[in-house]
Amino acid sequence: MSSYFVNSFCGRYPNGPDYQLHNYGDHSSVSEQYRDSASMHSGRYGYGYNGMDLSVGRSASTHFGASERARTYPANSTSASTEPRYSQSAAASHSPPPDPLPCTAVAASPVSESHHGVKNSLGNSSSTSSNSSSSTHISRDGVGTSSGTEEDTPASSEQASAPSDQSTAQPSQPQIYPWMRKLHISHDNIGGPEGKRARTAYTRYQTLELEKEFHFNRYLTRRRRIEIAHALCLSERQIKIWFQNRRMKWKKDNKLKSMSMAAAGGAFRP
């Protein structure tokens, strides 16, 4: 239970003699408006409660500084002479407690009276040992829980990264749609390892269109060759070579036909 909770609970029940908060010591030494948690000694818990901060990693020697930081918010109980001591930073609370105040200062202000009560409670060896053991136990539990959360965090991150790795591994091979395929075999391997150009395979549609064009005109202008190349998804070089080969074949066929006709005509001569 922190000192903030105790102070807020005491403010809810301002009448000290009518309501004693969990047997927290003598109510006569505490003002009605503000009940100091450091001057209350709990009979329920097995240690002297002096307003210590039960956070992780604090030692028993810093209880005095923690109780001072816990009492900074009530304005009516702080004096101008002790304000610089209460405005210390969190890093300064790890230092050993300051020197005790003189007896005149103890009798002067209620805050110094609470300091005296803290000193008396710290003077008890059994309560100090129980404080140190309880704070050590709490710090161990806190460290254990924090380490558990830190161990759970990498496991959850690994589980989250596993599906992402699977999702990134799936699209490694892009899907090829039909309109991405070429209608003819690629002729990029002209300068192959064997020095031979691969034979270009034309589709049935491409061969039919080229035969139609050759039937109308055996020679093509460059403009017409570009149009046919775009229409058949071929290059100008392929169109030119196909027409050259087709003309050579046509000449050969005509020569054989003429030779056969000549031979046949000579045989039927009288």
From Swiss-Prot:
Superkingdom, natural source: Eukaryota
Region named Disordered: 67-173
Gene3D superfamilies for the chain: Homeodomain-like
GO cellular component: nucleus
Matching PANTHER family: HOMEOBOX PROTEIN HOX, HOMEOBOX PROTEIN HOX-A5
Motif range (Antp-type hexapeptide): 176-181
Bias (Polar residues) ranges: 74-88, 144-173
Pfam families associated with the record: Homeodomain
UniProt name for this protein: Homeobox protein Hox-A5
Annotated GO MF terms: DNA-binding transcription activator activity, RNA polymerase II-specific; DNA-binding transcription factor activity, RNA polymerase II-specific; RNA polymerase II cis-regulatory region sequence-specific DNA binding
Family of the protein in this entry: Belongs to the Antp homeobox family.
Transcription regulation is among the record's keywords: yes
Lineage, broadest ranks: Eukaryota, Metazoa, Chordata, Craniata, Vertebrata
The entry's DNA-binding region: 195-254
Ranges of Low complexity composition bias in the record: 124-136
Location in the cell: Nucleus
UniProt function note: Sequence-specific transcription factor which is part of a developmental regulatory system that provides cells with specific positional identities on the anterior-posterior axis. Also binds to its own promoter. Binds specifically to the motif 5'-CYYNATTA[TG]Y-3'.
GO biological process: anterior/posterior pattern specification; bronchiole development; cell migration; embryonic skeletal system morphogenesis; epithelial tube branching involved in lung morphogenesis; intestinal epithelial cell maturation; lung goblet cell differentiation; lung-associated mesenchyme development
